[in-house]
Swiss-Prot record:
Gene Ontology MF: a single term: ribonucleoside binding
Protein family membership: Belongs to the RNA polymerase beta chain family.
Name under which the protein is recorded: DNA-directed RNA polymerase subunit beta
Organism: Bartonella henselae (strain ATCC 49882 / DSM 28221 / CCUG 30454 / Houston 1) (Rochalimaea henselae)
Quaternary data: The RNAP catalytic core consists of 2 alpha, 1 beta, 1 beta' and 1 omega subunit. When a sigma factor is associated with the core the holoenzyme is formed, which can initiate transcription.
Name of the gene encoding the protein in the UniProt record: rpoB
Length: 1383
């Protein structure tokens, strides 16, 4: 401990120091939060081949399972040797910019072996072997942050939860049959291959189903495995031998058989004939044992006792071979007579008592019509392939391929391990197919369950569900691709001259590459990354989905699957899951959880040995944990680390119980191991209702990064971990000294891990105003200064939503809980104008607009400034190439990129033809297809990118962008070169100074002692010419020179590569000649209609922004920033927000006190009061920063950080209690009630009673009114109904639904209603007329027939109901005419 104190006694101001309220020591370190993704994919790719070759897993296993491939005649074989990856063509940043996939070319080394086959003997000799590396497409690589870049966008592969392979026993809970009888079933689920179901029906007959096809009696399946009827009976039942004894029979006496039996007749000793127990008596276990001890060997039973039992063996006449009775026959009166006739003195009976042992297998045998193996195989063949005539060979081959062929059936290691565990088998996990013993064991277990022994499985237990992460999903996908390829290879091997071809000629890698592309592009589990803020990224990578291929569907998932299960504890978060149809199907991994090699989620526990809690940590899966008694992390311990309570609350086998302390053998590692990352960021989570905590977790992921990030006063200690692991904040890769810093990059001269092959310089490029997937702004800001020392892992730059390396999703604002003129009714939020003026909740959003110039049939489109019929005013912001300048302010309708498209030739009049013939060719017509700003969008152009196809001449703008990029690369190269020079020449100087030089550059007198002055006379490049006597030193100098030259060359090579990439044309989609992307940044201040939320599920919409002077204010004149409704708390039961408010108030009060002492120190130079105050605040324990070791400067830096408000950490389930909050309020000189007198800003009068005031952390969510507000006059219409489309994205209209129609009907507003249903909607002719009338300034129009009425008429006609419309006026006229003619 002393050592760490000495190291941290300097404070650099680059991290946020928090007062820690947790009491429980952190024993285990939290695993890296994106380990799930990285470890899984690394294991799949295994880029670096380990010593001794790659193990059979991941990509290696896929190739091994498909290769070797032989042709149909067996004359050639293609073997897999190994694979390797070349380096990726483009780095991550280049792929993002050019819309490419970040991937590395995969090269597979294959060996083609050609055989000479002897036609007579069939023996093979190797004729020829060829080996070759074959390109097999590109394999996407994972970025350091656990994402993939596919076509320029970041995507995440979400892990999938599915049912583990293995065997499951279950029953239908009495639902299938009217009697409510439980029908038991077993199901063997492989990783891939046919499912096998074995189930009881209502008559207790056991059936088997293969792949949910028609059922067959299970005995047919056993016969197909090669058993006959007597084998089956002897496998499942014991035999009891009955010997004839006078007029009755004698049977051996066994305690197990007779215990608990109620005797129907007297129990008679067969040897002595005496009655040892009387009829009607129940034999207890004790009595049964007593009889055995007295020497009872056999008992006598009457003939009647045989009735209803079953024969175990056939009764045969051995002379004639005639079978009198078959095994399994029931004994009745007739059977007894046959036994008497054939004089059978000894018979074997099946040990079935219908109580402990049922006759299910025997009854199934009797129902089964199949008698032999052939019948059974044919029956199974007919079920699997109906309509095909079976032969013995095809039936046998088909049955073998179902369960016993490793090509077709794979239990996987997990499935085998699960089967061994469930049925006490002992089979190595390399046996991945079913064996006869497995099927027998399943049937036996099922019968045991029906007999009331054993337990059914719980499919929602995490011991029976496993996680498929990226690597495994990818492995399955690649296998599909290779299998598609295999067919093509086989056909090609047969069709070509095999002696002359190379492996390259046999392989078409397209199917494999297509399978990978399809998986990353369109799989349900490959998702567009949620990049709103760092927390949403991290949560997305830790997500577990039960949906997706091979998983559940929303509609079919029941309540049980979605519910929280006791095994979720410490593995899956019980809080964080979406609201809505996906609830419970999409989950989040708990903070400390990890996935083991079998795909089961493990949680860490501390071992308890002899009652003492150790610091040894073990990870257990749900199956292993159920055997232990696990104490909670907050169980009270004594000074020696033993459990202090006599009885301890603990978990065991899914139950919570009080157990004696000597039973307890494990303890939780941390109280937050129960929840996910997002839930662990909510302070006072323990005081919030679960529903609101769920909303809080989900809403933190929607928080928009603000222009000025500010970490919360009241945190949980998780903030720095999330910022570090998400990759938002930049951490130093190696220790070193900061050499240069500007807004775009940090250059650090490494001082450790100086590998000659690596550069001694780390250049960190910072992302400046990049667009995220959700259009939020990614911007990194340096925290270090030139000359700063940084250690490996230190945070050197803040990213979006981070503040000094802490996650900062929102801002601390001064809140008052009180109603204010109804403006905070129904969760509305009242804000102060200060919030807007000081840009407290201002965020920057970056929109991307893309335009492509294509080659059309009528000619190429052109990007140009020369646009027909556009005023010069509209072109003022475009450069000569027709592309907007950076920095231009744009508004709706402004041109971003000018583009013209050739128009089709319109037919010419004879006059035009004549004129054209006289004056020559007129320029073909073009129309304006420029890209304009969409309605409602304002902003500033921040970046423009121009992409040209190979061979297309670049315009001026593209050249300028290219020059700029090359200059940037050159600066990087020069900086790295100068640091390299400085380092190398400093080392060379150290080597040479003080040594005698035998030789030197031109003009140097030999054998002179060198010093810096002498060396200073020569240029540095000539210093290498100095030669010293010491041979060893001279060799070192030579080595240094070689290394220096290599580094210089490598640097230049890297630079030239990058320049070449910049100058090269871009890959474009077919038909696209040129593409321009324009990025427009919008500054969004908070405004009424924006959604805000706290961390406790307390969400609301801003209702009004009030002038500062009208806001309620404190006694010292400080105005509240935000006013919330107190009625939003009690019914929602999220009291955490109130505790946070009080604690935040104390933090701010304490900050003020520290600020006063800082001012005092600046005036008087006396630091002692400040030191005492900070030391009193920060306890001296392992959790807190060792402020007592700080020197004065460090303490001053810390005080400056604290003066805005002291930051504290209150971990979930182990945080500050009420007493702690009271104490802190009193320390800060505030009222311990947390309430103060507030004054009304409008009148200056105090309010009637004290009001709760404090600091609360509020977030601005990504539901902004600017993105939602929308208006339309005319726009696109639906093709069929001719009604306007819906939604902002389609520029649609507002739906006037049936309820709105009722409202107008109720008002009797007939004309308004007619207008709504006709001209404003789908009366095509009518709406044109209205438009014309408005243009004319007229206000008369007539409504016609709505198009939707015509659709209705057409639909009725399709039902053979003809509807014709007649003109009413004509009808009336006709009627009148007919009336007059009649008269």
């Amino acid at each position: 401990m002393a050592q760490t104190l000495a190291m941290t006694s300097q404070f650099n101001g680059r991290k946020r120091v928090r007062k820690f309220f947790g009491k429980i020591p952190e024993v285990a370190e939290m695993p890296n939060l994106i380990e799930v993704q990285k470890a899984s994919y690394d294991q799949f790719l295994m880029i670096e081949e380990p010593k001794g070759g790659r193990p059979d897993e991941g990509l290696q296993a896929v190739f091994k399972s498909v290769f070797p491939i032989s042709d149909f005649s067996g004359t050639a074989m293609l073997e897999f040797v190994g694979y390797q990856f070349d380096s990726p063509k483009f780095d991550v940043e280049e792929c993002r910019q050019r819309d490419l996939t970040y991937a590395a070319p995969l090269k597979v080394i294959l060996r083609l072996i050609v055989f000479d086959v002897d036609e007579d003997t069939g023996s093979k000799d190797i004729k020829d072997i060829k080996e070759q590396g074959v390109y097999m497409g590109d394999m996407p690589l994972m970025t350091t942050n656990g994402t993939f870049i596919v076509n320029g966008t970041e995507r995440v592969i979400v892990s999938q939860m599915h049912r583990s392979p293995g065997v499951f026993f279950d029953h239908d809970k009495g639902k299938s049959h009217s009697s409510g009888k439980f029908l038991f079933a077993a199901r063997v689920i492989p990783y891939r291959g046919s499912w096998l179901d074995i189930e009881f029906d209502a008559k207790d007959i056991i059936y088997a189903r293969i792949d949910r096809r028609r059922k067959i009696p299970v005995t047919s399946l056993l016969m197909a495995l090669g058993m006959d009827a007597s084998d089956i009976l002897s496998t499942f039942y014991n035999k009891v031998t009955y010997e004839r004894d006078g007029d009755g029979w004698r049977i051996p006496y066994s305690v197990d058989r007779f215990k608990g039996m109620k005797l129907v007749s007297d129990l008679i000793d067969a040897d002595s004939g005496e009655v040892v127990a009387e009829a009607g008596k129940k034999l207890t276990v004790r009595a049964a044992k007593a009889l055995a001890e007295k020497g009872l060997k056999a008992v006598k039973v009457s003939e009647d006792d045989l009735l209803g039992s079953y024969l175990a063996e056939d009764i045969v006449n051995y002379q004639t071979g005639e079978i009198y009775l078959e095994a399994g026959d029931e004994i009745d009166e007739k059977t007894l007579r046959v036994l008497f006739d054939v004089n059978a003195d000894q018979i074997d009976i099946l040990d079935i008592d219908h109580m402990n042992i049922g006759a299910y297998i025997r009854n199934t045998l009797k129902v089964d019509k199949n008698e032999s193996r052939q019948d059974a195989l044919f029956d199974i063949y007919r079920v699997m392939r109906p309509g095909e005539p079976p032969t013995m060979d095809t039936a046998e081959a088909m049955f073998h391929s179902l369960f016993f062929d490793p090509e077709r059936y794979d239990l996987s290691a997990v499935g085998r391990v699960k089967m061994n565990l469930r049925m006490d088998l002992d089979c190595p996990d390399t046996v991945r197919v079913l064996r006869q013993e497995d099927i027998l064991a399943v049937v036996k277990m099922l019968v045991e369950l029906r007999d009331g022994r054993g337990e059914i499985d719980d499919i929602d237990n995490l011991g029976n569900r496993r996680v498929r992460s990226v690597g495994e999903l990818m492995e399955n996908q690649y296998r599909i691709g290779l299998l598609r390829m295999e067919r093509a290879i086989k056909e090609r091997m047969s069709s070509v001259e095999i002696d002359t071809v190379m492996p390259q000629d046999l392989i078409n890698a397209k199917p494999a590459a297509a399978a990978v592309r399809e998986f990353f592009g369109s799989s349900q589990l490959s998702q567009f990354m949620d990049q709103t803020n760092p927390l949403s990224e991290i949560t997305h990578k830790r997500r577990l989905s039960a949906l997706g291929p091979g998983g559940l569907t929303r509609e079919r998932a029941g309540f049980e699957v979605r519910d929280v299960h006791p095994t979720h504890y410490g593995r899956i978060c019980p809080i964080e899951t979406p609201e809505g149809p996906n609830i419970g199907l999409i989950n989040s991994l708990a903070t400390f959880a990890r996935v083991n090699k079998y795909g089961f989620i493990e949680s860490p526990y501390r071992k308890i040995i002899d009652g003492k809690v150790t610091t040894e940590v073990i990870y257990l899966s749900a199956m292993e944990e159920s055997k232990h008694y696990v104490a909670q992390a907050n169980s009270s311990l004594d000074a020696e680390g033993r459990l202090s309570e006599e009885f301890v609350v603990c978990r065991h086998a899914g139950e919570v119980l009080m157990a004696p302390r000597d039973h307890v053998d494990l303890m939780d590692v941390s109280p937050k191991q129960l929840v996910s990352v997002a839930a662990a960021l909510i302070p006072f989570l323990e005081n919030d209702d679960a529903n609101r905590a769920l909303m809080g977790s989900n809403m933190q992921r929607q928080a928009v990064p603000l222009v000025r990030a500010e970490a919360p006063f009241v945190g949980t200690g998780m903030e720095s971990i999330v910022a570090r692991d998400s990759g938002a904040a930049v951490a130093a890769r190696r220790s070193g000294i900061v050499d240069q810093v500007d807004a775009t990059r940090i250059v650090i001269r490494a001082t450790e891990d100086l590998d000659p092959s690596k550069s001694g310089v780390d250049i960190y490029r910072l992302q400046k105003f990049q667009r995220s997937n959700q259009s939020t702004c990614i911007n990194q800001r340096p925290l270090v200064h030139v000359g700063d020392r940084v250690e490996k892992g230190n945070i050197i730059a803040d990213g979006p939503s981070t503040d000094l390396g802490d996650l900062a999703l929102g801002r601390n604002v001064l809140v008052a809980f009180m109603p204010w003129n109804g403006y905070n009714y129904e969760d509305s939020i009242l804000l102060s104008e200060r919030i807007v003026a000081d840009d407290v909740f201002t965020s920057i959003h970056i929109e991307e607009f893309e335009v492509a110039a294509r080659d059309t049939k009528l000619g190429p489109e052109e990007i140009t400034r020369d646009i027909p019929n556009v005023a010069e005013e509209a072109l003022r912001n475009l450069d000569e190439a027709g592309i907007i300048y950076i920095g231009a302010e744009v508004q709706p309708g402004d041109i971003l990129v000018g583009k013209i498209t050739p128009k089709g030739e319109s037919p010419m009049t004879p006059e035009e033809k004549l004129l054209r013939a006289i004056f020559g060719e007129k320029a073909s017509d073009v129309r304006d297809t420029s890209m304009r700003m969409p309605p409602g969008a304002f902003g500033t152009v921040v970046e423009v990118r121009v992409f040209n196809r190979h061979g297309v001449e670049k315009d001026e703008r593209a050249m300028a962008i290219e020059r700029e990029e090359i200059e940037r690369l050159a600066k990087d190269r020069d900086d790295e070169q100068s640091i390299l020079d400085r380092n190398v020449y400093a080392r060379l100087t150290d080597m040479l100074v003080g040594k005698v030089a035998v030789e030197g550059p031109k003009g140097f007198s030999k054998n002179k002692k060198l010093d810096t002055t002498i060396m200073g006379h020569y240029p540095r490049s000539q210093w290498w010419q100095f030669t010293v006597e010491d041979e060893k030193l001279q060799n070192e100098i030579e080595a240094l020179r070689n290394q220096y030259d290599e580094s210089k060359e490598a640097l230049q090579r890297r630079f030239m590569d990058k320049v070449e990439k910049v100058q090269r044309g871009d890959e474009m989609p077919p038909g696209v000649m040129k593409m321009v992307k324009v990025f427009v940044a919008v500054k969004r201040k908070i405004q009424p209609g924006d959604k805000m939320a706290g961390r406790h599920g307390n969400k609301g919409v801003v209702s009004r922004i009030l002038p500062i002077e009208d806001m309620p204010f404190l006694e010292d004149g400080t105005h509240a920033d935000i006013v919330l409704n107190p009625l939003g708390v009690p019914s929602r039961m999220n009291v955490g927000q109130i505790l946070e408010t009080h604690l935040g108030w104390a933090c701010a009060g304490m900050g003020k006190k520290i600020g006063d002492l800082v001012d005092l120190y600046q005036e008087t130079g006396d630091i002692l009061p400040l030191r005492q105050r900070i030391e009193n605040l920060m306890p001296d324990d392992d959790h807190n920063e060792p402020v007592r070791q700080y020197d004065n400067e460090s303490l001053y830096k810390l005080a400056l950080q604290m003066r805005k408000g002291v930051s504290i950490a209150t971990p979930v389930f182990d945080g500050a209690h009420e007493a702690d909050i009271n104490m802190m309020l009193e320390d800060a000189g505030l009222d311990s009630s947390g309430q103060v007198t507030l004054y009304d800003g409008r009148t200056g009068e105090p309010f009637d009673r004290p009001v709760t005031v404090g600091y609360i952390y509020m977030l601005k969510l990504h539901h902004l009114v600017d993105d939602k507000i929308h208006a339309r006059s005319i726009g696109p219409y639906s093709l069929v109904t001719q009604q306007p489309l819906g939604g902002k994205a389609q520029f649609g209209g507002q739906r006037f639904g049936e309820m709105e129609v009722w409202a107008l009907e109720a008002y009797g507003a007939a004309y308004t209603l007619q207008e709504m249903l006709t001209v404003k909607s789908d009366d095509v002719a009518g709406r044109t007329k209205v438009y014309e009338a408005i243009v004319r300034g007229d206000d008369t129009f007539e409504a016609g027939i709505p198009e939707s009425f015509n659709v209705l008429v057409k639909e009725m006609r399709s039902l053979a109901l003809n509807v014709e419309l007649d003109d009413a006026r004509e009808l009336i006229a006709q009627r009148a005419l007919s009336d007059t003619t009649e008269q």
